[in-house]
Amino acid sequence: MENNISNVRIHLHRKCDVNEQDIYGKTALHYAYTKRNIDIIKILLKCPGIKICIKDNDDYTPVDLICSTISSYIASSLENKIDEVDKLGETPHYENG
């Protein structure tokens, strides 16, 4: 992983466009999220001019992806803790989509 961080730093030092999109519309931040590489995400977010709301070809921004993961994680965590039943005798649950 350290090699990936070094590569990112080298590209940024060479003044590469941190917001450049590939043929799929994805930026470095999209890919850092996909790889769940928190260290690279932190480095990219410190870059002047970073745009966190660039949409890829599927209309997802890095913010969309991160928020959906956080929401799913929180919902799943809550669901695992809930053992109370409501008036209908059901436990709350989270539905995707």
UniProtKB/Swiss-Prot annotation:
Database matches in InterPro entries: Ankyrin_rpt, Ankyrin_rpt-contain_sf
Nucleus found in the keyword field: no
Regions annotated as coiled coil: none
Signal peptide: none
Record keywords: ANK repeat
ANK repeat spans: 24-54
Gene3D superfamilies: Ankyrin repeat-containing domain
Keyword Glycoprotein listed: no
PROSITE patterns reported in the protein's UniProt record: ANK_REP_REGION, ANK_REPEAT
Protein name: Putative ankyrin repeat protein RBE_0357
The species this protein was found in: Rickettsia bellii (strain RML369-C)
